[in-house]
């Protein structure tokens, strides 16, 4: 799931663009660093792309690809401001560069600037519709608690990519928050078929079972979520609620442990319609 207050599931950056070797950088190694997706460090990628830019031999669309690649590296390093600047340069050089719009949206998303992210995702989807683009836009809607539009986008993502586990997971959460519990349960179960050990999906399904008053099933899913990720407040608090509703006073210690990890966890559950009771 993608809960703004607990865990924002990462959006999907468009892969690095390989610019080709029509012009030479300062060294072949620096170009390889700029274009490589997996074999180099983030700092090497930044250095390589910076060398290509400084050499001044790339122009137009080719130079846009270099700026996009360096922006991806800055984003991976957590330097969103520089990433946004590089994506902006890429877009100025190539106004139809869908990947740069998508990637700038991801950077805005990471900074909590969801309206700007939505505008960039919108443009990316106009230029080149993709499952990842719809998923990213859905995440921005979800962060704004615009659950209906988020669900619409996850529908499109799943239509284009039937095994998109993260889209099933996030659609599950959006539906759960809206109280559309049976479809939400189906989505979480499908996400778990695709990624069985996903703690976030397990605690989403546990939350659905909690709302359905199926407390044993809720405890089972929260137990599984905590086995894979033991220091998370959301499943701890949910398990505590489910235990208390089942008459098990061990729920008190779960809820206390959850509050120690996240002081406002009770308020978060209350926003989703699950108040603490004694």
Regions found by a protein language model. Name each.
Residues 42, 80, 114, 147, ...:
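TPR-repeat structural position
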Residues 52, 56, 89-90, 123-124, ...:
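Canonical positions in the second alpha-helix
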Residues 55, 59, 93, 127, ...:
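Structural marker of alpha-solenoid helical repeat scaffolds
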Residues 35-37, 65-75, 99-110, 132-143, ...:
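Conserved alpha-helical positions within TPR/SEL1-like repeat arrays
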Residues 28-33, 241-278:
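Terminal, low-structured helical/coil segments at or just beyond the last alpha-helical repeat
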């Amino acid at each position: 799931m993608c809960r703004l207050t607990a865990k924002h599931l990462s959006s999907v950056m468009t892969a690095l663009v390989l610019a080709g070797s029509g012009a030479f950088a300062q060294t072949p190694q620096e170009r390889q660093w700029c274009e490589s997706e997996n074999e180099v460090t983030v700092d090497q990628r930044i250095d390589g792309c910076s060398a290509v830019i400084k050499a001044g031999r790339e122009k137009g669309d080719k130079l846009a690809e270099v700026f996009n690649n360096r922006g991806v590296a800055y984003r991976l390093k957590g330097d969103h401001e520089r990433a946004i600047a590089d994506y902006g340069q890429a877009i100025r050089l190539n106004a139809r560069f869908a990947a740069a719009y998508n990637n700038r949206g991801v950077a805005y998303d990471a900074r909590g600037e969801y309206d700007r992210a939505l505008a960039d995702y919108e443009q990316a989807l106009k230029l080149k519709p993709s499952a990842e683009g719809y998923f990213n836009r859905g995440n921005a809607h979800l962060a704004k608690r615009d659950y209906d539009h988020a669900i619409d986008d996850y529908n499109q993502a799943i239509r284009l990519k039937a095994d998109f586990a993260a889209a099933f997971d996030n659609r599950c959460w959006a539906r759960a928050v809206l109280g559309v519990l049976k479809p939400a349960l189906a989505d979480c179960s499908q996400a778990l078929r695709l990624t069985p050990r996903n703690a976030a999906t397990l605690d989403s399904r546990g939350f659905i079972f909690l709302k359905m008053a199926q407390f044993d099933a809720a405890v089972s899913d929260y137990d599984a979520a905590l086995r894979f990720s033991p220091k998370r407040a959301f499943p701890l608090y949910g398990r505590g609620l489910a235990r208390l509703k089942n008459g098990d006073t061990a729920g008190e210690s779960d809820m206390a442990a959850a509050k120690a990890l996240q002081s406002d966890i009770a308020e978060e559950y209350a926003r989703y319609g699950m108040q603490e009771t004694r």
